[in-house]
């Protein structure tokens, strides 16, 4: 079924398959000789060219997609002053260019939806007449900017305005003035340093330093950019766990590669392990350590393949004794003051101490604190992580009740109570005559998988 976009004084049609190819970031479709032949006669008899329509829509949505920088109509200037990924903006800019080229009476067919994606990262989906046109990842700070300039967050309606004249007549494609107005506001936004610290910084606006930090210099160095062979760095291994293995590849920095202690690759995009995605972990490590340059997510070429890894500062300190109650409370209070909470704070080695200063070196299970959650909602990655943690606690509680281990029963009850308080759930009172009731999870859900894995042990 073809979709029709009202562009300027004419309409453009594109098939669902070709539109899907554009959305999925495939290359521009190369029309065959037969398709060109048919389109030639279509143009003679109907004055329509589907090939021309396709190219017009493609060029609006995919501006200079083959180039690493946006060359126009959007200037790459703002990206040179900040650590910005212009590829995240490209789908959005193409979508707004498409709106700008459309007839004013059809603009109400364009809508936007915002979905939870990764921690502090949202997925912006852009539609035309209910059909998904394009999508892109966006930081929460950038979404706040778009809510002010582009769309109504409550209903998804487009609120873009033309530059200086909302009633500019559309005689030619792109003459509405909408894109030009948005471009000016976007440049102002990108060239204004992010005043927020900690969790308000996102993947698009990670740092505003005019000079690259030492960690950035390391990531951009030939030492990091070269092809790394695992067998060559095995001697630099300093630890491993469920989410990855850490190697010291520099005097000042370590790299965490998503291969666990059993040598199995960890899929950081899966529901089970989304919480350990380097983008997310880096944000929380920076928050926990109150240091925006403590860590970074980066791409490393390992055995000839690009792999997303976590780069963080190397701390030559001692393991902090969290078994000491005073130490435990001190670390907990420090995290709370920085707006975060650490689910695995009790694990020895996750916190180091150097010259009296605490360093949090494992961020896979760091989440927003209870106070921070009053200001903003958590992401899908955090919700899935805490579902797994609660399922684990409930299994342990069930076993303790079955074995009559009173001490463990009280311990796991307290953990569940604390978790419920953190995520804002009310404690469920057990039914009369039953001390514990575990509702059967829906088959195929993440919790069901966790329960099955636990019961196999």
From Swiss-Prot:
Sites where the protein binds ATP: 256
Cell compartment(s), UniProt: Secreted; Host cytoplasm
Any one Gene Ontology BP term: protein autophosphorylation
Nucleotide-binding as UniProt keyword: yes
Coarse class of the protein's main subcellular location: secreted
Entry's induction text: Expression is regulated by the two-component regulatory system SsrA/SsrB. Highly expressed in host macrophages and when grown in an acidic environment.
GO MF term list: ATP binding; kinase activity
UniProt GO cellular component terms: extracellular region; host cell; host cell cytoplasm
Post-translational modification: Autophosphorylated.
EC number: 2.7.-.-
Alphabetical UniProt keywords: ATP-binding, Host cytoplasm, Kinase, Nucleotide-binding, Secreted, Transferase, Virulence
Primary role: Effector proteins function to alter host cell physiology and promote bacterial survival in host tissues. This protein is a kinase, which is required for SPI-2 T3SS-dependent F-actin meshwork formation in infected host cells.
Family that this chain belongs to: Belongs to the protein kinase superfamily.
Protein name, as recorded: Secreted effector kinase SteC
Source organism (scientific name): Salmonella typhimurium (strain LT2 / SGSC1412 / ATCC 700720)
Gene this protein is translated from: steC
